[in-house]
Amino acid sequence: MGVEWTNQYKLLPWMSLDLDLAYTRARFTDFDPVGNFIPGAPSWVASGGVTFGRDTGWFGSLRARYFGPRPLIEDDSVRSLSSFIVNARAGYKFDNGMRLQLDVLNLFNAQTNQIEYYYLSRLPGEPIDGVADRHVHPAEPLAVRLTLAATF
């Protein structure tokens, strides 16, 4: 069971705001003594931003994404941390189809994980039965990308 809210508001002919929110109470419906939580299903997810620009000239955006904490196993005894990432973009569109764009990903260099799992694994020197532990894909650190593109 859940609800989603998606909207976009045009403040000016060259500027818009958008916000997407989702809430869910994700559970397995059949009884299981292990638990009824769905691993990896966050209760809250949000994304939004401000975008500006016209067909030519300056353009840009500031965008944010949030994933709430989520159960990593069915009994909800192990949970992930929430994550919050902000990205920025600025550039210039020329009337000849050229575009110069600068992207700053993970603008605030958030030390968070893109995704987390919890399962048995075995590294050298660990017990033969393995060790239950978190397995993560960390968010990429702050990165800057410059793009020069042409449309023809």
Where are these regions (language model features)?
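Residues that define the transmembrane beta-barrel architecture of outer-membrane proteins
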Residues: M1, G40-A46, S82-V86, E140-V144
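Gram-negative outer-membrane beta-barrel transporters
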Residues: M1-I73, A149-T151
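Glycine-rich loops and low-complexity Gly/Arg-rich segments
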Residues: L17, P42-V45, D75, F84-A90, ...
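Flexible, active-site-adjacent loop/turn segments at secondary-structure boundaries
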Residues: A26, N36, R70, S83, ...
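Flexible, surface-exposed loop regions and adjacent strand-edge segments
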Residues: P33-A41, F67-G68, S77-S82, E116-G125
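Short, glycine/charged-rich beta-strand-loop motifs at protein surfaces that mediate ligand recognition
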Residues: I73-R79, N87-G91, L105, R134
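C-terminal beta-signal and adjacent terminal beta-strands/loops
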Residues: Y92-F152
